[in-house]
């Protein structure tokens, strides 16, 4: 005889089985990693092979610094072998990491940016949160069991380490820091009848740039006697837009990933840029090429580029990308980027950071952390900072006597002590408190790209005879939203639940109803008895 108890029991089992099946189906293809926990000790009886992905263009000195750091580290830890893989572009590192996440073949240690890390973190326990490693008394920052002199947490430049906090945890350590500088042909500015102010303003740069467009009767430009003159060239237009918005207190994005860039201030900025691009007074790297080349050839007055590119700026620069016969002798000045409010300077902080990827073996992760931490030692920090207009990320290195001696010898030669390079570093050292970074979230890389794309599109449009009006800007905003999928980030209506989720929730609901029915049935039966 089929009893009520059996009916309910069978129905309950079926519902639970269906719910379990759907739950497993929903997880098909997902890769789960256990969260990393710091081991009590580092097992030095085992051998570890770790990979380190880093960026380098053509600077052989930087490559040698990485190689020397690896060699020195392996002498301290002979049971750890570090394999270096160099890239010439951060974007390629980013793409390769994304590709390798799905196959669990990420590198152990990687030079990267917080924007990129935010995307890596969409995977499950992919990037190691470093808080517990920072504070570990044995192997953390300044730990007692380390075989090298590591900085303590308090010896980081505060602004630089805070840039590596994503949400409530630290997911990176800073490696090097730079900012943008405006490299100015002071000779031409004065020839045009102007005197450089203490702080550059956007109004000043635009005015001088337009004045430099005056031509002689033979068609040459009056300021340089050449047929080519682009007074103002910006290398990174995403940074240009970001800083112009920040300086005016306008929206870009918030920490929650809500996109705020499509506002009236952005429209005003683009109209301003359009007017100067139309006259020929302004251009970009993507449109015209590297600003340093035009600057060194006497064909540019204001060249904005990273302080990490200072060795390419000036007619006596250690690195030149044009032939000697094209060089023009001039006095070069190094300034922060132009400002709207000189009493409240705002300049972007940039430069690579280091993240550690999670692995199945906690000992392997600890070995990776030891190497990442070794890159913070004074020897590595100072050597790498001296290759360009970088600054070390620790106060420990910045105050090291050898680094202070290096800074004091600016201009002694046009190589290690190239004056412009050291001035670029000093610019950031003097303005660290004025630096900022943009909010980091999954999608912040796309927003950054979109901010520069709007400037590029605007400049190209007016050069082709287009008109930048409200109709154009409306269309531009919609185009970049679509191109970079910006409607997918921030607060939005997620729409109805997938059918699988609806079915799963229905099964769970039925399960609880049947459980309740079974309890009631039992109570009634006991009462009758």
Name these PLM-found stretches.
Residues 42, 114-179, 221-225, 327-338:
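Hinge/lid segment of periplasmic solute-binding proteins
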Residues 131-155, 198, 223-224, 230, ...:
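Short, solvent-exposed loop/beta-turn-alpha elements that line the ligand-binding surface or hinge
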Residues 162-175, 180, 203-258:
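Extracytoplasmic/periplasmic solute-binding protein
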Residues 208-210, 255-286, 332-333, 337:
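Glycine-centered hinge/linker elements that transmit conformational signals in sensory
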Residues 275-282, 318-396:
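Extracytoplasmic/periplasmic substrate-recognition and gating elements
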Residues 47-51, 56-118, 293:
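Early extracytoplasmic/lumenal segment of secretory-pathway proteins
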Residues 420-529:
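Conserved C-terminal helix/tail region of periplasmic/extracytoplasmic solute-binding proteins
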Residues 332-339, 385-453, 457:
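Long, aromatic- and glycine/proline-rich binding clefts that accommodate carbohydrate-like moieties
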